[in-house]
């Protein structure tokens, strides 16, 4: 699964690209639900700061 690191700027680009809606707005940044994530990598491909990383 992918996780979003602290470089997240909460732009929301990743959430719009997730085909399974695994990405939601958290308190300070976006969060990926590891149980829902299908490891497609769309979030990492569109993130302007490279915050999503595969675990």
UniProtKB/Swiss-Prot annotation:
Binding locations of [4Fe-4S] cluster 2: 18, 37, 40, 43
Pfam families: Fer4_7
Cofactor comment text: Binds 2 [4Fe-4S] clusters.
Source organism, top-level taxon: Bacteria
One GO location term (cellular component): cytoplasm
Keywords for this protein: 4Fe-4S, Electron transport, Iron, Iron-sulfur, Metal-binding, Repeat, Transport
Keyword Ubl conjugation set for record: no
GO MF assignments: 4 iron, 4 sulfur cluster binding; electron transfer activity; metal ion binding
Domain 4Fe-4S ferredoxin-type, residue spans: 2-27, 28-55
The UniProt record lists the keyword Nucleotide-binding: no
Cofactor: [4Fe-4S] cluster
Residue sites binding [4Fe-4S] cluster 1 per the record: 8, 11, 14, 47
Function: Ferredoxins are iron-sulfur proteins that transfer electrons in a wide variety of metabolic reactions.
Protein name per its UniProtKB record: Ferredoxin
Species this protein is from: Clostridium butyricum
């Amino acid at each position: 699964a992918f996780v979003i690191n602290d470089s997240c700027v909460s732009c929301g680009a990743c959430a719009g690209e997730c085909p399974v809606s695994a990405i939601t707005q958290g308190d300070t940044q976006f969060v990926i639900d590891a149980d829902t994530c299908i490891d497609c990598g769309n979030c990492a491909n569109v993130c302007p700061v490279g915050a999503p990383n595969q675990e």
